[in-house]
A protein has these predicted regions:
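Structural signature of the two symmetry-related core transmembrane helices
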Residues: 90-104, 187, 292-307, 387
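C-terminal membrane-cytosol helix-exit motif in multi-pass small-molecule transporters
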Residues: 187-209, 396-401
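Transmembrane alpha-helix termini and helix-breaking/packing motifs in multi-pass membrane transporters
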Residues: 47-52, 163-181, 365-381
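Helix-loop boundary and gating motifs at the non-cytosolic
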Residues: 14-68, 229-266
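Helix-to-loop junctions at the C-terminal end of transmembrane segments
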Residues: 74-86, 172, 277-289, 374
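Glycine-rich segments within core transmembrane alpha-helices of 12-TM secondary carriers
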Residues: 151-166, 358-366
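Juxtamembrane intracellular "pre-TM" segments in multi-pass secondary transporters
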Residues: 5-21, 203-235
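Cytoplasmic helix-loop-helix junction between adjacent transmembrane helices
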Residues: 118-157, 338
Length: 411
C-alpha cells in the first residue's frame, strides 16, 4: 500500500465523524469584516496614489512589495511566538487591533511616503495575526477536513473582499469621488472585527504545556519539518512570484479607461469568483491529490495573465480578473492545508510563519518587478512575466511526479 493509500484509508472513518468547529466560522467572519475594511481602501489606493498624490507605477509596485515583505518578516516571529507561549488568540487579537488602528493613516495621507508608512503599519498587524490565526484554525480542525476549514475561512474573507469594493463604488459615486471619506468609513468594519474576535473565538487549551524550551525555536525543531513541508514551501514561493499584488488589476482597469469611482469593480469580479470557488475547492483538496490541484490552479493563472497582458477592453479585463480569482480559489486553501498536515502540531505556528515569509518575500519581488516592468514595458510585460513564472510551477510539479527523488505526494 502506498503512502497516499494508507493516509486515505486511515482518514476515511475520520472524515465521516469530523465536523468543523464554530471557531472556524467565527474566524471567517472576523476575516470578512477586516477584508471588507481593507478592500474598501485598497480597491481605490492605486488610483489614489497615481491621480491624487502623483505617484508612478513603479512607486505603487514598491509600496505593495515592501508592505508584503514587512508582513512576511513579522509573520515568522509571530508564528514562532505562538508556538512558544502555547497561545494563539492573544497574538491574533493584537494583530487585528494594530491593523484597525493603523488604517487611520490612510485618510490622513498627503504623500506617497505616508501611504507607504500606513501600508507597512497595517501589514505589521497582518503579520502579527496571520500565522497564529492559521495555526489556531488548524488546531481546532481535524486533519481529514482541514482543506474544508481553510476553504471556508477564505470564502468568508472573500465575501468581505467583494463587499468592500462594492461599498467603495457606491460611496465614491455618492460623494463625488471623495477618496478620503471612503477611507474614513472603511475603518468601521475593521474595528468591528476586533469585537467579534474577542467575543466569539474560544481557544482550546495548550496540548503541549511541558514542551516549551528556553529558546522559541531550536535546530531540532526545524529537523521535524520534513521534506514534504519544504517541498510545499518551495512550490508556494515560486507560485507567488507569478502572482503579484491585485493592485495591478486595478491599475489595468484604470489603464483601459475605467473611471476612478468604478475601478474597484475589477476586484468585485475577482473576489466574487474567489469566494464562489474557495470552499468547494477546499473540500476537493481533502479528496484528490493536492499537487494535481495546484497544477490546475497554475494553468488557470497562466491563462489569466496571458489574457490580461493582451486585454484592451473592460470585458476581456474582467474575464482575466475572473480567472485570476478562480486560480486563487483553487490554490489558496490547499497550500495552507498541506503545510498544516506536514508540520507537527506544536510547530504549526512556526510552519505557517515560514510559509508566509517565503510567500511574502516572493510577493515583494513579484510586485516590485511588476511595477518596474509596467513602467518601462507597459502592462503586457508585467502580466507576461507572471505567466512565465506560473508555467514554471507546472514544470516543477511535473518533475515532482516523474522524479523518484522528489517527496511523495499527498498529505
Amino acid at each position: 500500500m502506498t503512502t497516499d493509500e494508507h493516509d486515505s484509508a486511515r482518514a476515511a472513518p475520520e472524515k465521516e465523524a469530523a465536523c468543523l468547529s464554530p471557531n472556524v466560522a467565527v474566524l471567517g467572519i472576523v476575516s470578512l469584516l477586516m477584508g471588507m475594511s481593507s478592500a474598501m481602501i485598497y480597491g481605490l489606493l492605486p488610483v489614489f496614489l497615481v491621480t491624487i498624490l502623483g505617484a508612478s507605477t513603479t512607486t505603487v509596485g514598491l509600496i505593495e512589495g515592501t508592505a508584503e515583505a514587512t508582513t512576511s518578516a513579522v509573520k515568522i516571529f509571530s508564528g514562532v511566538a505562538s508556538d512558544w507561549i502555547g497561545r494563539r488568540k492573544p497574538l491574533v487579537v493584537l494583530g487585528y487591533t494594530l491593523s484597525a488602528v493603523n488604517k487611520l493613516l490612510f485618510p490622513l495621507a498627503e504623500s506617497a511616503s505616508i501611504v507607504l508608512i500606513a501600508r507597512i503599519a497595517d501589514r505589521i498587524g497582518k503579520g502579527v495575526r496571520d500565522a497564529p490565526r492559521d495555526a489556531l484554525l488548524a488546531d481546532v480542525t481535524p486533519s481529514a477536513i482541514r482543506g474544508s476549514g481553510f476553504g471556508l475561512r477564505f470564502a468568508l474573507y472573500t465575501v468581505g473582499a467583494v463587499a468592500g469594493p462594492i461599498a467603495a463604488i457606491i460611496l465614491m459615486t455618492l460623494s463625488g469621488d471623495n477618496f478620503r471619506l471612503v477611507f474614513w468609513i472603511a475603518l468601521l468594519p475593521g474595528f468591528a472585527s476586533i469585537g467579534v474576535l474577542l467575543i466569539g473565538v474560544k481557544e482550546p487549551p495548550n496540548q503541549h504545556p511541558d514542551e516549551r524550551g528556553w529558546l522559541p525555536i531550536r535546530r531540532h525543531d526545524l529537523a521535524l519539518l520534513g521534506a514534504p513541508f519544504w517541498w510545499a514551501i518551495s512550490i508556494a514561493a515560486i507560485f507567488s512570484l507569478g502572482r503579484f499584488s491585485p493592485a495591478f488589476l486595478v491599475l489595468k482597469a484604470h489603464n483601459i479607461g475605467v473611471d476612478a469611482a468604478f475601478v474597484p469593480i475589477i476586484l468585485v469580479i475577482m473576489y466574487s469568483i474567489y469566494c464562489a470557488a474557495a470552499y468547494p475547492f477546499g473540500m476537493l483538496a481533502d479528496r484528490i491529490n493536492r499537487h494535481l490541484q495546484l497544477g490546475i490552479g497554475s494553468l488557470i493563472l497562466v491563462c489569466a495573465d496571458v489574457m490580461l497582458a493582451n486585454a484592451g477592453t473592460l470585458w476581456l479585463t474582467g474575464l482575466g480578473a475572473a480567472l485570476w480569482g478562480l486560480q486563487m480559489g483553487v490554490t489558496q486553501g490547499l497550500v495552507s492545508a498541506a503545510v498544516a498536515d506536514a508540520a507537527p502540531e506544536r510547530l504549526r505556528g512556526t510552519a505557517f510563519g515560514i510559509l508566509d515569509l517565503a510567500v511574502g518575500l516572493a510577493t515583494f519581488a513579484a510586485s516590485a518587478g511588476a511595477g518596474v516592468l509596467w513602467t518601462f514595458g507597459g502592462a503586457a510585460s508585467s502580466f507576461t512575466a507572471g505567466a512565465v513564472l506560473a508555467a514554471a510551477v507546472i514544470v516543477m510539479l511535473l518533475f515532482q511526479f516523474t522524479s523518484k527523488r522528489a517527496p511523495a505526494s499527498g498529505r
